[in-house]
């Protein structure tokens, strides 16, 4: 079962316009109850944040992820502005997981991008 905070290799093709595409890492951000249901049923959708190795500029709605702690091959950033739901069939293999601090930063980036401040 995939868990919140895990990084998975996913297949985002076909994509349109400026959507993240190709096979790439993504951080699972859907809650573990939804993830467990999708696993149990063998179908359904989970929510992920795509990751890119282009870290020349990291915006406030993006989170830098260290290769040394995540299982990624190089330092990357999670792109909260690219959040999306994907079919579980798009999950290819687990890579690693973000730290608790990185997941908290990603939660803040998602709040900023989605304007969920309370």
From Swiss-Prot:
One of its GO terms (biological process) is mRNA catabolic process. GO terms for molecular function: DNA binding; RNA endonuclease activity. Its EC number is 3.1.-.-. InterPro entries: PemK-like, Plasmid_toxin/cell-grow_inhib. Toxic component of a type II toxin-antitoxin (TA) system. Upon expression in E.coli and M.smegmatis inhibits cell growth and colony formation. Its toxic effect is neutralized by coexpression with cognate antitoxin MazE9. Acts as an mRNA interferase, specifically cleaving between U and C in UAC sequences. May cleave its cognate antitoxin's gene. In E.coli expression with non-cognate antitoxins VapB27 and VapB40 partially neutralizes the toxin. Belongs to the PemK/MazF family. PANTHER family: ENDORIBONUCLEASE MAZF-RELATED, ENDORIBONUCLEASE MAZF7-RELATED. This is Endoribonuclease MazF9. It comes from Mycobacterium tuberculosis (strain ATCC 25618 / H37Rv).
């Amino acid at each position: 079962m995939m868990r919140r905070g895990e990084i998975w290799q996913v297949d985002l093709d076909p994509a349109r316009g400026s959507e993240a595409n190709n096979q790439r890492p993504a951080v699972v951000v859907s809650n573990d109850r939804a993830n467990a249901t999708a696993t149990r049923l063998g179908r359904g959708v989970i929510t992920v944040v795509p990751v890119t190795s282009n870290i020349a500029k990291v915006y406030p709605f993006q989170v830098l992820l260290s290769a040394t702690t995540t299982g990624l091959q190089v330092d990357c950033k999670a792109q909260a502005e690219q959040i999306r739901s994907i079919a579980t069939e798009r999950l290819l293999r687990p890579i690693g997981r973000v730290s608790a601090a990185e997941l908290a930063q990603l939660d803040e980036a998602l709040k900023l991008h989605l304007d969920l401040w309370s």
